[in-house]
């Protein structure tokens, strides 16, 4: 058994070696004993099958297992020479070249090594965050919104017409081209006028109706309406108004606060809670609209390290397969039947693959640095929640993700969000502390 090793960089190494066939044959007896322990052949007791029978029936497996053991010995010796611990390898070593000659096998093995990242100054890379002060008016507006949402609906007893901000209890049936359509009918439906719950123009057309009045209104479905067969079409609705309802707003005081946040609460503590919620909403908006993508690019620029080529190649394969799945059949066949074109198209994903692998290593290292983790239950909850929000069956969605090995990707996305939120939260707190300090000095 002979080999040479080459450390290409901190994340990649190559082993070139040869193993004599006689060395592999020395493994036969050991391999045969392993096989004998586990096989069962009619006419023989388990573990008592004659060696010659095993050699005849399992010749191919014996050759493969013995060869694998010899390669493993070569790999172990080469790792020792390279001073690489087996647990620092990432992915499986790849046999990139393999030639079987009359007296030996020659092979090349490529190794991917988990890179080491320097995260000493990572918090300095987080962009500055400027938070708007949560004003008293904003808090009061949210309080009024909460009160409005919790207010009971009471029927208007005096005779008057339907107005904006009222709630109309109606029967309705819609028609397109003179025919009723699915989902276009409702009875005793409570519709808040001004909520824009129905298609544009519908709610405004009800204003001025009286109890018991019937009215036919004409509207046009938006061009981008979710039901494609209705998009852009004119429709008429027969509407009957049964009741005019109005919300009775509660008094916003300590009792109201208790009904919202519990007996230990008062109006001031509720306002404090609302302020925290508004700050969280502001941070989330800034994170999603401005900082997430910006912070990722900053981390990619400032935390540089060698990438394991094997992992980059795997990511290129994933991106290439995803791109192929989006092609029209004729475009797919064109690439499928042209190896040169396939290689060319696959290569276009290299930069994206490198960036994806780099940010994955960065996020994993940051998660370890800050003791951030995502457990399996959180992943399941996320999958179930998103499925329900999309109107899909959660169990079927989970099975789809598991079958297509998509769960790890979801977990990685969740981890990335949590790590970035952690870094930005630290910056938010710094910004908040600086703002408070400036106020104290004024």
From Swiss-Prot:
GO terms for molecular function: peptidyl-prolyl cis-trans isomerase activity. GO terms for cellular component: cytoplasm. It is found in: Cytoplasm. Residues 165-250 form the PPIase FKBP-type domain. Its main location: cytoplasm. GO terms for biological process: cell division; protein folding; protein transport. Its EC number is 5.2.1.8. InterPro entries: PPIase_dom_sf, PPIase_FKBP_dom, Trig_fac, Trigger_fac_C, Trigger_fac_C_sf, Trigger_fac_ribosome-bd_bac, Trigger_fac_ribosome-bd_sf, Trigger_fact/SurA_dom_sf. It is an enzyme of class 5 (isomerase). Belongs to the FKBP-type PPIase family. Tig subfamily. Involved in protein export. Acts as a chaperone by maintaining the newly synthesized protein in an open conformation. Functions as a peptidyl-prolyl cis-trans isomerase. Consists of 3 domains; the N-terminus binds the ribosome, the middle domain has PPIase activity, while the C-terminus has intrinsic chaperone activity on its own. This is Trigger factor.
